[in-house]
């Protein structure tokens, strides 16, 4: 019997096509296309596995499209800026710098926390932004500076409350095997990327609770995917992602929404310059033991610097997707719990989560392994 001979089947097919088309168009315009497609593909695959009839499958998909369209529509409802105040950490450069300028143009009162108040990034913010933006000295590894910023912010906003905190400050390290990364680097990454964000969160939560606002933590796709050579960085980003997931539930009763941003590869200053990599290389070599020297060799470390131009070339120079997602997290009436910013980021994270570990390791090993092997392995071969 032809499955399309009944009027019910044609009705379900038409409803699925119309609702699905509307959903995909809306998802495309909002930048959330990947998640919607994966969701619908999963539903279709599940229907096939359950051996449902075509009519039942189409009915399931049409209902799902309607539900996702409803959720997608509600997610697009934006709250008025209305002089809301936002604190952004790590605003010297990169995402934080661009975000501070972007929010200022939208009409927010912006508190831009910078590592160096007299640096070029801070000076550019003062020069190019409105009087609504304040540049504040804020090294997130120094509790006294965090408290000073809190006092200044509380004094300026008075009874308005602080609408959002964006924990963006972060550091990367020289890309090398986890065994070779000095403990000082592990501690620095943890101090900035995790403990700094946690302390900022704890200090400013009373202000967020007052406004029932937003806490936005910038993590990384590296928190979800075990890329080689970034053991210290990825571990800290995984920590902030889990911290965000836990306090998202804890703060819900206070009306505070917690959002995690997982950017893919973008060109920012976090990658560092040739000079900074030279210093990091020297630090690694200074910590070499005799056994490490025999097994790896200095040339193995030196060749990792060749990855710098490759990393930049593979990264997206347009950080608009990240700014768009953070803006949505701050402004949307019903923001998502997490955003995956960038090309293929969501699909990569889904693949890492659901593929067999052996397959994931094989792909990562073959596509992200240094060309030069350690000295001992080269000698053995």
From Swiss-Prot:
Keywords: Endoplasmic reticulum, Lipid biosynthesis, Lipid metabolism, Membrane, NAD, Oxidoreductase, Signal-anchor, Steroid biosynthesis, Transmembrane, Transmembrane helix. It catalyses: 17beta-estradiol + NAD(+) = estrone + NADH + H(+); testosterone + NAD(+) = androst-4-ene-3,17-dione + NADH + H(+); 17beta-hydroxy-5alpha-androstan-3-one + NAD(+) = 5alpha-androstan-3,17-dione + NADH + H(+); (20S)-hydroxypregn-4-en-3-one + NAD(+) = progesterone + NADH + H(+). This is Estradiol 17-beta-dehydrogenase 2. Belongs to the short-chain dehydrogenases/reductases (SDR) family. Catalyzes the NAD-dependent oxidation of highly active 17beta-hydroxysteroids, such as estradiol (E2), testosterone (T), and dihydrotestosterone (DHT), to their less active forms and thus regulates the biological potency of these steroids. Oxidizes estradiol to estrone, testosterone to androstenedione, and dihydrotestosterone to 5alpha-androstan-3,17-dione. Also has 20-alpha-HSD activity. InterPro entries: NAD(P)-bd_dom_sf, Sc_DH/Rdtase_CS, SDR_fam. NAD(+) binds at residues 83-112. The keyword Ribosomal protein does not apply. Homodimer. The chain crosses the membrane at residues 4-24. Substrate binds at residue 220. GO terms for molecular function: estradiol 17-beta-dehydrogenase [NAD(P)+] activity; testosterone dehydrogenase (NAD+) activity. Its EC number is 1.1.1.62, 1.1.1.239. It is a single-pass type II membrane protein. It is found in: Endoplasmic reticulum membrane. GO terms for cellular component: endoplasmic reticulum membrane; intracellular membrane-bounded organelle. It comes from the Eukaryota. Coiled coil: none annotated. GO terms for biological process: androgen biosynthetic process; androgen metabolic process; bone development; cellular response to metal ion; estrogen biosynthetic process; in utero embryonic development; placenta development; response to retinoic acid. The keyword Oxidoreductase applies. Disulfide bonds: none annotated. The active site is at 233 (proton acceptor). Highly expressed in the placenta, and in the small intestine, and liver. It holds the Pfam family adh_short.
């Amino acid at each position: 019997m032809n499955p399309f001979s009944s009027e019910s089947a044609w009705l379900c097919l038409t409803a699925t096509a119309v609702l699905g088309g509307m959903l995909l168009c809306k998802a495309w315009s909002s930048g959330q296309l990947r998640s919607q497609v994966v969701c619908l593909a999963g539903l279709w695959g599940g229907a096939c596995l359950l051996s449902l009839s075509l009519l039942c499958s189409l009915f399931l998909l049409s209902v799902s499209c309607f539900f996702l369209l409803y959720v997608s529509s509600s997610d697009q409802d934006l709250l008025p800026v209305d002089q809301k105040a936002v604190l952004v950490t790590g605003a010297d450069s990169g995402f934080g710098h661009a975000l501070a300028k972007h929010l200022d143009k939208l009409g927010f009162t912006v508190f831009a926390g910078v590592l160096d108040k007299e640096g070029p990034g801070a000076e550019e913010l003062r020069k190019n932004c409105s009087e609504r933006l304040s540049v504040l000295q804020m090294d997130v590894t120094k509790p006294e500076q965090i408290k000073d910023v809190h006092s200044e912010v509380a004094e300026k906003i008075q009874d308005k409350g602080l609408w959002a905190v964006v924990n963006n400050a972060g550091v990367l390290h020289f890309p090398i095997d986890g065994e070779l990364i000095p403990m000082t680097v592990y501690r620095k990454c943890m101090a900035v990327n995790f403990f700094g964000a946690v302390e900022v969160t704890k200090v400013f939560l009373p202000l967020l609770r007052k406004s029932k606002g937003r806490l936005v933590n910038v993590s990384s796709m590296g928190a979800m995917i075990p890329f080689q050579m970034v053991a210290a960085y990825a571990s800290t980003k995984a920590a902030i992602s889990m911290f965000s997931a836990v306090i998202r539930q804890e703060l819900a009763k206070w009306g505070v929404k917690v959002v995690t941003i997982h950017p893919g590869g973008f060109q920012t200053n976090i990658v560092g310059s040739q000079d900074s990599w030279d210093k990091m290389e020297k630090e690694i070599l200074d910590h070499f033991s005799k056994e490490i020297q025999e097994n790896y060799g200095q040339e193995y470390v030196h060749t990792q610097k060749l990855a710098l131009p490759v990393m930049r070339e593979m990264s997206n120079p347009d950080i608009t997707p990240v700014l768009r997602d953070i803006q949505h997290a701050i402004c949307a009436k019903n923001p998502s719990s997490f955003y995956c910013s960038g090309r293929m980021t969501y699909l990569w994270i889904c693949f890492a989560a659901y593929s067999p570990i052996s397959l994931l390791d094989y792909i990562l090993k073959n596509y992200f392994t240094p060309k030069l092997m350690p000295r001992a392995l080269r000698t053995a071969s």
